[in-house]
């Protein structure tokens, strides 16, 4: 008899255009599917209330009862503000703005069972921050300014 998977924090990615779906697909190509996850794509012509409803439906889809982590693309944007509407006291929710591929790879490879959304969010936020690097920091080489640029 197979044992049931332990409940874990659900993941919703809310982005402009199809960015969220592309990030999930890229993570799956690299490391395998990100469990208990879905994406919501927001288009410019969409009414804000419709975005909020779709984000809520996505949260319902991945909620196993332990809470939701929502990753948005841009702080302060319509997708991000729609995510804020999910913080309504009905279930544990945390939101992180600035989603990137290293965050999703971390989520695909870490065990989210037994953790609260805020704990998962802190881990993912740190991975996202550490993944942003300048090439010159890594190589010690800097671009040479060209004289013809004004």
Per-segment meaning from a language model:
Residues 1-150:
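N-terminal loops that bind phosphate or other acidic moieties
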């Amino acid at each position: 008899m197979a044992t049931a998977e332990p409940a874990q924090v659900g993941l919703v990615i809310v982005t402009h255009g199809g960015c969220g779906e592309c990030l999930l697909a890229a993570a799956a190509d690299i490391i395998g599917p990100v469990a208990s996850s879905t994406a919501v794509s927001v288009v410019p012509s969409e009414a804000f209330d419709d975005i909020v409803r779709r984000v809520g439906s996505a949260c319902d889809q991945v909620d196993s009862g332990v809470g939701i982590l929502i990753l948005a693309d841009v702080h302060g944007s319509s997708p991000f503000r729609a995510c804020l509407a999910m913080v309504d006291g009905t279930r544990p929710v945390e939101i992180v703005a600035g989603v990137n591929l290293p965050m999703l790879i971390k989520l695909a490879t870490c065990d989210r069972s037994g953790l609260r959304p805020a704990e998962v969010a802190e881990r993912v936020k740190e991975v996202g921050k550490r993944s942003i690097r300048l090439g010159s920091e890594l190589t010690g080489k800097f671009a040479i300014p060209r004289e013809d640029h004004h």
